[in-house]
Amino acid sequence: MVYIKQIELSHFKSFGGTTSLPLLPEFTVVTGPNGSGKSNILDALLFALGLSSSKGMRADRLPDLVNSTYASRSRSTVETLVTVTFALDDWQPEAEETEEGEGTGLQPGMAEWTVSRKLRVTPSGTYTSTYAMNGEACTLQQLHEQLSRLRIYPEGYNVVLQGDVTNIISMSPRDRRQIIDELAGVAQFDRKIEQAKGKLEAVKEREDRCRIVEQELIEQRDRLAKDREKAQKYQALRQEQATKQSWEAVLRWRAGQRQVQALQRSLAQLATDAATDQQTQQTLEQQIQQTEATLDRLNQRVKALGEEELLKLQAALAQQEAEQRQSQRQQQELVESQTQTQQQIQALLQTQAQLQTEGQQQAEQARTLQTTIAQTLQPQYQQALEQVEAARQSAHALAAQSQDWVTRQTSLRQQADAIAAQVEPQRAEQAQLQERQTQLQQQLEATQSALVTVTAELETETEQAEGDRAALSQAEAAVVTAADQLVRLEEELQIQQETRDRLLKEQRDKQRQLDRQESLRQAMQETQGTAAARLILDTGLPGVHGLVAQLGRVEPRYQLALEVAAGGRLGYLVVDDDGVASAGIELLKQKKAGRITFLPLNRIRAGKQPEIPRWQQPEGLVDLAIALVDCDDRYREVFKFVLGGTVVFERLDQARRYMGQYRIVTLDGELLETSGAMTGGSIARRSGGLSFGSPDSGESAEVRAIRDRLEQLEVILDRSELQILNLQAAIKDAASTLSDRRQQQREQQLTVQQRQQTLQRLQQQQQQLNAELQQRQQQASQAQARLAALALELPAALKQLKTLRQALAELEDSPIHGEWQQRQTLLQQQEALLQQQETALRQAEQQLQQLQTDQKRLQERAIAARTQVSQLRQQQGEQLNRLAQLDEQQRQQATAIAQLQQRQAQLEAQLGQEKVDRDRTERQLQEQRSQRQNLVWQQEKRQQQQQELQQQLTDLEVQLQAEQQELPQPLPDIPEMVQQQGIEALQHELRSLAKRIQAMEPVNMLALEEYERTQARLEELSEKLTTIEAERTELLLRIENFTTLRRRAFMESFEAIDRNFQEIFAHLSDGDGSLQLDNPEDPFSSGLNLIAHPKGKPVRRLASMSGGEKSLTALSFIFALQRYRPSPFYALDEVDSFLDGANVERLARVIRQQAQAAQFIVVSHRRPMIEAAERTIGVTQARGAHTQVLGIPQP
């Protein structure tokens, strides 16, 4: 808990010397006689902490705070020093504070923190005041910054003086509301709003500058647009001229090309003919050669009887037959494979049947065996068991007859059996221990191996668990971050929605205001006649010039005088003639739109104007009214009619001398008629009235402000709606992200839990293996020790057993022993038979179990056989498909073989015609040789013609090559119509274009580039203006959001303080009270009223209460403020002075209750307050000199 631990005063006011006042964190009352210096302790707090000026410490100047006795005795510099020590028990800085690292400031872990202030006063009356923290100098601002960390504020109510209660009572409601403004931090929002408005003004200035530049660029662009249009036309004509000139050159060149092509075609035709003849000749030569070869071949074929072709056909036929055989082999293989598959299926089916049969047989065997066991083996075993029991009883009877022999034999046998019984278990135990030791060694090795494995797994899982826990921490941090983001977005959305709702309400209110103003304006227009004029002007009636007020202009200093002189005639409508006026009157009648006076220019006649010679001008005369109007000459008669012969004087006293001589108006608006009537007094310039230069009843500044605000609200609301939509989308995304992060967190938690379970399981396994290892080691040690003991005990026991058995053998040689031996032999035989029967029974049971196992194995084999049968049948289906393909292939091969065989038969039939063909070929050879001779004669004639055409082609190509170098590259595309019209029409168009181009010159060709540059600058500026507009809208929305936050902060503070006030007032007065705003809808233009309802009295406002009630209400308000923003200490100076005893008791109880959370120092001399205090400090003056303090024991 933070509290004031000590106050040290040196020469402060009534305190002489140095006085230390220790304090405790409790309810302390400072009491004493009037004038003893009680309140000076609180003044010392205000002085040291810089919470008040000298006026607040009841001093005119700071030097008055120095002890007067001390100051009067000393002729040198005097000083006063006050030091306040704070105890910082358990104090920690707020989470949002940043540590500055300064030694003088508050630091975590400090036990105490001191603040001091020294005032030095020189003999001349000048003074210096210095503050210090922990003995180091600081500024007042630095001190207040550190005090604010302790929740001690200059504007707070840590120290409440008598005047503070009175101020609460006497201050205006608006000032009282400003107290809550300070606590709510409204000033901070006001600073933000002002900063935003400053930025908005800067943005507006930038926008205005850009608008000016934009207007200049638009004007420049419009000027350049005309030059650009002419330059574009000129450029198009020049381009068209160049294009058509290129067309002309191309057409000339193409005409030459066509001539070249014609010659080339002729040459080509000759060459083609020559080539054709040559080809024909070559063909004839080839035909001749072929015919000769054919003739030779026919001769040979006739001799050879066509053997070669027949061989080829036979080879092809053999190939087809080989392929057919190959297909048949494949088909055969598939058939065989299919057969094998079918055989495998049959074998498997047989196997299935065999397995089924074997299963049935084994089942039958099992049933038979079960019957044998139940009906034969089990009864035989019971019978043998009964016989063994009978033999044993007979042996016992024989033993009773030969008691001595039996006794001795029994004794020896018992001894031998006892030793054997002792030895045999030991030998068996030794064997078991040896086997056990071997098993334990193996188990130890296995356990150690398993322990190593589990330990390695445990280390791996531990590392993974650490990683999982780190991932879980990250997932939890991500969830917190996503949740904070969602909360921030929702808070911002709520602010935006509140701002939107508030602006919508303001928009509706402004619209209603505008509607009321419009209604008033319309009503005023109707009374002035301008409504009818507006109707005439809006209909576009020809011949209407406008209202008289629109057609003239005057200087502002004469405007009032001339408007008074003109009066209602400013609302007359000027038209061309009386016909237009008649049509306007008819229109008003039809529309029932009221009446108006028309002034036809062809009919209007003004009266005679007074003439005042310049040398006779009266004192104070300004001029004739008509001379002060600036208008078009055609409206001069109109204004003479409107103003009449009115003259303008400066003042009324000057005009009165000429009253009755002229119609006079003064600059202040007094009107003096020639009839003697005088009009004057106070004049109100009504909004909406007609004035010179206004088109109609202009809008008032209030209406324009409302319209501007409505436009601004429309822009801000659009931006706000966009922000709300964006925030809603962002909230949706943030909620989705938060859900995903939470799901990841849950998954990670599940992973960590599973990993923890795995770790626990491995740890348990490790513990079990360790315990098992220890147990095995202990068992091995025990077995080893027991084996060592047996190695010592067994040899002696075996020797004794041998001796006993020899003695027993000698005894058994007697006759009694023979009979005993027979009985024993019979018993052994029957026991052996019993053992055989038992063995047979056990074997039968094992065989039955084996049969059951075999039945299970047969079932598994049957299932496998069924699966294999299914696979083989699938393979069989694939083989059938392949057989069908091979059948189709064999049919095609058979068809090909049949065709080859048919051809072979035809060739064999044709061999008989070979001789006839040979004779026909000889005649053909003679005709071909004759054609070859005619072609030789035609070739010689064509060669001569070709040489003449080649010379013409060479000359024309040289000419075209020179023209081709001047052609544009690539060649332009010439329209089909131009090609059809010909080169003469094109040359005519070129001459016409040349004349048009010459007529347009000169042309500003730079306008093309300048226009584009200007347009680019204008587009860039438009983008910049769009950005500035968005920035301005954003600033407007920010201002509105700050306004929303300011109102929210105020209302939250107001509502909290109101709740505190109601609770505290109920304790102080046994009544109820509340805080009330004059206008809750607009709290910042409202005042704050304290409404109280003391018990048994009607509800009253603060002004109508008694003095005590006012004090209680004001104190309740102060305590409500303190509770809203708590501080570590409070000091009250005689706040109970206006209260009666009962109210002082209630006040003391409230303070004692409040003191549980903060330190209270109360200056009072009222008994109920002193009795309620936990500690009392007395203040007195020693012999009227200095104030002294002392502790008073509590009763």
UniProtKB/Swiss-Prot annotation:
CDD domains: ABC_SMC_barmotin. InterPro entries: P-loop_NTPase, RecF/RecN/SMC_N, SMC, SMC_hinge, SMC_hinge_sf, SMC_prok. One of its GO terms (molecular function) is ATP hydrolysis activity. It is found in: Cytoplasm. Residues 185-241, 273-348, 380-528, 698-1043 form a coiled coil. One of its GO terms (cellular component) is cytoplasm. ATP binds at residues 33-40. Residues 542-658 form the SMC hinge domain. Keywords: ATP-binding, Coiled coil, Cytoplasm, DNA-binding, Nucleotide-binding. Homodimer. Contains large globular domains required for ATP hydrolysis at each terminus and a third globular domain forming a flexible SMC hinge near the middle of the molecule. These domains are separated by coiled-coil structures. NCBIfam families: SMC_prok_A, SMC_prok_B. Belongs to the SMC family. Required for chromosome condensation and partitioning. This is Chromosome partition protein Smc. It comes from Synechococcus sp. (strain ATCC 27144 / PCC 6301 / SAUG 1402/1). The gene is smc.
